[in-house]
A protein has these predicted regions:
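Short helix-capping segments at alpha-helix termini
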Residues: 54-55, 140-144, 171-172, 302-308, ...
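A structural signal for isolated positions on well-ordered beta-strands in alpha/beta enzyme cores
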Residues: 60, 85, 149-151, 312
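Active-site metal-coordination/substrate-binding segment of hydrolases
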Residues: 81-149, 382, 388
Length: 415
């Protein structure tokens, strides 16, 4: 049951304002476009100005890389207590072919209760939830304890340089728990899949298309690697089974280019090299070093039977599987808040990919709960949307969860 103070906090979440804020953010094109130099910068400027105006604190804007900025702010209650981080990202993926959209991808149009646009659920809606949660605590007049740390970072959709820079600069050192409002239909996601990213280069020997025997075709060798990796994937699925929340592991070839960028392709030329990127998603029963060793072993086996087989495998990113238990204070606070705000029992789940919370958990040991508005399987698709009712529900749950966590928890990192 909500207390009188919590009812005041819920009332401080203005639904119309929340929707307008989300629309404003969606209308800012924060797709990373190297050809034009477009980045998250305009979104960062908007958010920083909002924080100054609405929270009365000075945000910190820092470059994680040239033109790629994080915006950070701390709202302090003035009373001793934990530090709760509200984390989000300002970058969005490309809208792709606009003819596949039935709405303007940056129009933030609302039709039949759905707010459409690129990044509407992933995750401009979540950023708006974080901002209004912080403001409700700061301005409602309801007493609270501890601090809120807003960390709204760049490049989550890339190599996550934003959250890595945030951590390296010490902004997570005093954080006791983190809420990540990624699109999860307001389900409480206790775990996140791991990820291993790999780059494959297969080297052959160029030849005329009419005389392929005078060369070595890298594409046929790459095809053997694809099939061998698929067999390993099938064996791992059989061995691990389906994780309760994360499902099955996977190995996906996401990019194949032959010849690689910079070498013009010609119909009558057998290329001398092929490039591939592989996205490997892992579950709790898998050890990353064992997976890496197995993939290296596959290449060694293929090379042992083909003297012309030459392939290099470089692992360019490693994101471990992370998980927290239902007994974590931030989970308890969020579960009870969800039940009391909505009248429904919480649904527990896992994130099918990684989030910025992966590194907060893996590098700093911070309990991270991922739960935010938006369809779980819609991000990165055309006609992306967030349900307005789900958006408002998320903000109301968040403000109660934050208040309960800060009131009942003792900082594990400082006091």
């Amino acid at each position: 049951m909500l207390s009188d103070a919590e009812r005041r906090l819920v009332a401080a979440i203005d639904a119309d304002e929340l929707v307008r804020l989300t629309q404003d953010l969606v209308r800012i094109d924060s797709v990373i476009r190297p050809e034009t130099g477009n980045t998250e910068r305009e979104a960062v400027r908007y958010i920083a100005a909002w924080i100054r105006r609405e929270l009365g604190v000075a945000p910190v804007v820092e470059e994680a890389a040239p033109g790629r900025e994080n915006v950070i702010a701390t709202v302090d209650s003035g009373r001793p207590g934990p530090c709760l981080m509200l984390e989000g990202h300002t970058d969005v993926v490309s809208e792709g072919a606009r003819e596949r959209w039935t709405r303007d991808p940056f129009g933030a149009e609302i039709v039949e209760g759905k707010l459409y646009g690129r990044g509407s659920c992933d995750m401009k809606a979540g950023v708006a939830v974080a901002l209004l949660t912080a403001r409700a605590l700061a301005t409602s007049g309801v007493p609270w304890r501890g601090k809120i740390r807003l960390g709204l970072v760049c490049d989550e959709e890339g190599m996550m340089i934003g959250i890595k820079d945030f951590i390296r600069r010490g902004h997570a050192d005093d954080v006791d728990a983190c809420l990540v409002p990624e699109p999860e239909e307001n389900q409480l996601c206790l775990s996140m899949k791991g990820a291993i990213r790999a780059k494959l280069i297969v080297t052959g020997r160029m030849a005329h298309g009419a005389m392929p025997l005078t060369g070595v075709n890298p594409n046929t060798r790459l095809a053997r690697i694809v099939l061998a990796f698929e067999r390993f994937e099938a064996a791992e699925k059989q061995r691990c089974g389906a994780d309760e929340f994360l499902g099955l592991p996977s190995i996906t070839f996401t990019v194949i280019q032959s010849p690689p960028p910079g070498s013009p392709a010609q119909l009558n030329v057998m290329p001398g090299e092929a490039l591939a990127y592989v996205d490997i998603r892992t579950v709790a029963k898998q050890d990353h070093e064992t997976v890496r060793a197995a993939l290296r072993g596959i290449l060694a086996e293929l090379g042992a039977v083909d003297p012309d087989f030459k392939a290099s495998l470089e692992f360019i990113e490693d994101r471990p599987v992370v998980a927290i238990g239902k007994d974590e204070p931030i989970v308890k606070a969020s579960a009870s808040a969800f039940a009391d705000v909505t009248g429904r029992p919480p649904v527990y789940n896992g994130v099918p990919g990684a989030t910025d919370g992966t590194f907060l958990s893996a590098w700093k040991g911070i309990p991270c709960l991922v739960n935010g508005p938006g369809p779980r399987h819609l991000p990165h698709q055309a006609d992306e949307y967030v349900e307005v009712t789900e958006l408002v529900e998320a903000a109301r749950v968040y403000v109660v969860a934050a208040h309960r966590f800060l009131a009942s928890s003792v900082s594990r990192r400082r006091d």
